[in-house]
Amino acid sequence: MALPIIVKWGGQEYSVTTLSEDDTVLDLKQFLKTLTGVLPERQKLLGLKVKGKPAENDVKLGALKLKPNTKIMMMGTREESLEDVLGPPPDNDDVVNDFDIEDEVVEVENREENLLKISRRVKEYKVEILNPPREGKKLLVLDVDYTLFDHRSCAETGVELMRPYLHEFLTSAYEDYDIVIWSATNMKWIEAKMKELGVSTNANYKITFMLDSAAMITVHTPRRGLIDVKPLGVIWGKFSEFYSKKNTIMFDDIGRNFLMNPQNGLKIRPFMKAHLNRDKDKGLLKLTQYLKEIAKLDDFLGLNHKYWERYLSKKQGQ
């Protein structure tokens, strides 16, 4: 059962409508972090008591006997800028921690506070256009780490860690798609990786622009807590005359990155242990064919990219 709460902080009131009596005080604090930027450990919620004592983080909201739309006061200082708070966590093996996003989608995709964050990115995030968008082209958005190359293995050059057929894949895709790179890292590292791989200097294709972690947003999921995602709405908002849900596809090895846009995401198999798999991995070859097939369509909304291999086999069998 939903338990609407109004939280006052910094002269403003924040409406919390997505938590239930089964959620905990910590869930509330984590949600408030997404709204205010104040870290949970810095928050003090006045009026939340159990048996006369301040409620601990593990106490369920139902135990507080709150009436709907109860107003509570939050004290706490935002010690970091909002952008820092919303940025990605320190580097870890996201592939191990990935989860199936399907059950979370309905609760997250259209939530008002997430859409407001996207609007803020559209207004504030600066995109450096490397090559102008082309009229009539579809959009391919690509992750970098484990999608285009193995960023964990050691090698003398980046080329040794590059996913097989990368340049052939991008050359073919460029015929039908504008290409955008989006990585959950700092722009200077993205630029360095693209240069090392020979992507930014290849004469056979061009990159339209690149996005870094500052274009991402943090969303709260009821069961998984806070996660960072890549909302395609940032691109659609900035380039609405060229790109939309109908003509965009995004490749990423981490499914939760397209939690805000599940219809447009294709979860690619991660490319790891390059020295062992360099001669075996043919993922980009097959995806080259898939992109070529769906480029014939006027609208991608009828596709389910989860079954892209089935779709490709069916088309090639005709």
Swiss-Prot record:
PROSITE patterns: FCP1, UBIQUITIN_2. The modification N6-acetyllysine is found at residue 117. It is an enzyme of class 3 (hydrolase). It holds the Pfam family ubiquitin. Its main location: nucleus. It is found in: Nucleus. The modification N-acetylalanine is found at residue 2. It comes from Pongo abelii (Sumatran orangutan). Residues 133-294 form the FCP1 homology domain. GO terms for molecular function: metal ion binding; protein serine/threonine phosphatase activity. Transmembrane segments: none annotated. Dephosphorylates 26S nuclear proteasomes, thereby decreasing their proteolytic activity. Recruited to the 19S regulatory particle of the 26S proteasome through its interaction with 19S component PSMD2/RPN1. Once recruited, dephosphorylates 19S component PSMC2/RPT1 which impairs PSMC2 ATPase activity and disrupts 26S proteasome assembly. Has also been reported to stimulate the proteolytic activity of the 26S proteasome. InterPro entries: FCP1_dom, HAD-like_sf, HAD-SF_hydro_IIID, HAD_sf, Ubiquitin-like_dom, Ubiquitin-like_domsf, UBLCP1. Signal peptide: none annotated. One of its GO terms (cellular component) is nucleus. Its cofactor is Mg(2+). One of its GO terms (biological process) is regulation of proteasome assembly. This is Ubiquitin-like domain-containing CTD phosphatase 1. It catalyses: O-phospho-L-seryl-[protein] + H2O = L-seryl-[protein] + phosphate; O-phospho-L-threonyl-[protein] + H2O = L-threonyl-[protein] + phosphate. Keywords: Acetylation, Hydrolase, Magnesium, Metal-binding, Nucleus, Protein phosphatase.
